[in-house]
Amino acid sequence: AFGNVEKMSENIEITPDYYDLDQIYERVDGLEKSSGGRAQVFVIGRSIEDREIKAVRISKNNSDADLPEILLAGTHHAREWISYEVPLSIAEFIVENMDSNPYVSDILERSVIWLVPVLNPDGYVYSRDQERYWRYNRRINPDMTVGVDLNRNYDSSWMQVEYVHGTGPFSEPETVAIRDLMKNSFEKPFENGIKSLDGLITYHSYGQMILYPPGSTNDPAEKSEYYNELASKMAELTFSECGSVYLVMQTSVLYLTFGEMT
């Protein structure tokens, strides 16, 4: 599939402007309207301030239970505005070209694409309206500080650091929304009942790096060679398209992280 992704990437454009949340969701809803139902929009949860968290499922049809399922997730961190734009622009390109572009068509013949462009809607709104470099959600913590880092609130090697990682794994409605999406929406069950996700990319800025797990230990992952090969190919394609050099490394080489989504 690398060749098809390479061909598809030649035509994706990123808008120079950043949209407010209502405009982002108008674009998300527009995917369903313009795709003949092949892009489906779901509200997978609500934020701490009761804003919708939306997901999009793009497929050739609605009965592709045996296909690999890939999730692209953006805006864990409020201030990283480009992280919603990349997956959303990818989704728009796929929908616009699913019938006319053979490379896009082939990808959808072999996979189902899920997207959550804005996992942290409250933080995103706050970063636009109040504090540009705000990172967290808008949880009022027991010590009256504000905000939990959503990408430290998963159950993968979770570690409490005051309240910035939450009071426990999945203490935040935003991460619960992703967890429940994985439990309830992906088609193929694991042995433990959790649904099978075949690939996951989370988008962040800044840094020009492609990181792969694990982040909580310096020991290599069981599939570290595969992860490195995949990440290196992504970096190669990025360089060939725009001349930007992206570093490839295991997350923990940069620094140790606990409770990350990946």
What do these predicted ranges mean?
Residues 29, 33, 91-100, 120, ...:
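Sec-exported extracytoplasmic/periplasmic mature domains
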